[in-house]
Amino acid sequence: MLMRKKKLLSRISFGSLFLLCGTILSACTWIQANLRNLLKETTGKDFDLSKAIKIPEGRQNLINSLKKSYEVNPKDTTKLLLDAWKQSSEEGKLGIADLDFDQVTNPTEKDPFKNGAKGRAFRHWISKY
């Protein structure tokens, strides 16, 4: 079981995860300010996130900086990314059209996430990024 988890985590691109969270972060000024401070503290670089997220080089720099920040300060980086994910989820801005969250929270049919379907849905969704 432990080996399966390691294989799954190794397949998931952290770059994709950081890009998704970086995109989410750029929308919220409070989280954006915290991200900017965290990145400046750990990498020594000052980012204009609203501009960086719009161009491929800026997104790649943001991803690399988030990775470096995670290596230096995993607790704060993880907390920041989870806060951004939570806020975006509450505002309905995750952009996951493949998952019908109403059906998940109030199922009228059989459970859509039985027998490993949740993992397959996540891998399918993350592979797009």
Curated annotation (Swiss-Prot):
It is found in: Cell membrane. GO terms for cellular component: plasma membrane. Disulfide bonds: none annotated. PROSITE patterns: PROKAR_LIPOPROTEIN (PS51257). It holds the Pfam family Lipoprotein_3. Belongs to the MG439/MG440 family. Residues 1-27 form the signal peptide. A lipid is attached at C28 (S-diacylglycerol cysteine). Keywords: Cell membrane, Lipoprotein, Membrane, Palmitate, Signal. A lipid is attached at C28 (N-palmitoyl cysteine). The keyword Protein biosynthesis does not apply. InterPro entries: Lipoprotein_3 (IPR001595). It is a lipid-anchor. The keyword Nucleotidyltransferase does not apply. This is Uncharacterized lipoprotein MPN_654.
